Amino acid sequence: EAQSIAQFGKAKDIVNVYAFFEENNTAYIIMEYIDGVLLKDYLEKQGKMEPKVALHIIDLIINAVKKIHSKGIIHRDISPDNIFISSEDAIKVFDFGAAQLNDSAEGKNCEKVIKVGYSAPEQYRDKSNQGFYTDIYSVGAILYQMLTGIKPMESTEREHKDTLKSPLELGVKIEPNVDRAIM
């Protein structure tokens, strides 16, 4: 995990690692302190966000995910549990414990890492191909929750019977193209 994060240096939207070492058969990672709130806690307290705020925050998350992907890394655990909101104009993505390289055999044969409501269908399957699209699914699920206040149903359930209502159907004031992108 530390080696994955260390590649990003002083990125403003990915947690910074200052040092990592192993001692007494235990791995230690020294990371920056982030003064803020987990997106998960924010959503539990506030329910949902105004569309303008949600779209701004998702843009910040997308930029962080683009940086992660630019290093050939699939995060595989993008969720509100792993995103800090440190101010209105800053987020931090962390927890790279499930990360895999996209072009490696590992990326093609990943173990299951499942975060209910945010995991793409391929994450539920044994020895499935996972790629950058795995993280993109998670980003869409986060945006859905930020706009509606509803955590999406499991992706595997949606494959069989999709009853998830779009943000527009739920009365969220967004453009139809944004609604289609989410769904």
Describe these PLM feature segments.
Residues 24-38, 42:
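Conserved short submotifs of the Hanks-type protein kinase catalytic core
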Residues 61-73:
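Protein kinase catalytic-loop region centered on the HRD/HxD motif
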Residues 20:
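Activation-segment/catalytic-loop signature of the eukaryotic protein kinase fold
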Residues 117-183:
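C-terminal lobe helix-coil module of Hanks-type protein kinase domains
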